[in-house]
């Protein structure tokens, strides 16, 4: 089981298509964490991506990090590795949620 708002190391695979994030990188879980699902929805992160209104910049492990809401993904739980490396606080998670809603037009 994963924790909503926790940042994990995630394997996004090696498929080289367009500008999609790939390889192992950090991502925050945005799907409900209280359910033992076989898939989880995450927002990948980057320390070098270009800024955008739907890419909030927050600190993860002391480093300014952009949350790539435009690359939100649902992946198998087996691709989430290890324990959380960090946790978003309530205000940080609200910024990610707002960016998701804005990006999806909700």
UniProtKB/Swiss-Prot annotation:
Give the SUPFAM superfamilies listed for this entry.
Cell growth inhibitor/plasmid maintenance toxic component
- GO biological process assignments: mRNA catabolic process; rRNA catabolic process
**What UniProt keywords apply to this chain's record, in alphabetical order?**
Toxin-antitoxin system
Could you tell me which InterPro entries the record lists for this protein? PemK-like (IPR003477), Plasmid_toxin/cell-grow_inhib (IPR011067)
Question: Which superkingdom heads the taxonomic lineage of this protein's source?
Answer: Bacteria
**Keyword Plastid tagged:** no
Does the entry feature the keyword Ion transport, yes or no? no
- Residues annotated as coiled-coil are none
Functional note = Putative toxic component of a possible type II toxin-antitoxin (TA) system. Its toxic effect may be neutralized by cognate antitoxin Rv3098B/RVBD_3098B.
- Please identify the protein, giving its name as recorded: Putative toxin Rv3098A/RVBD_3098A
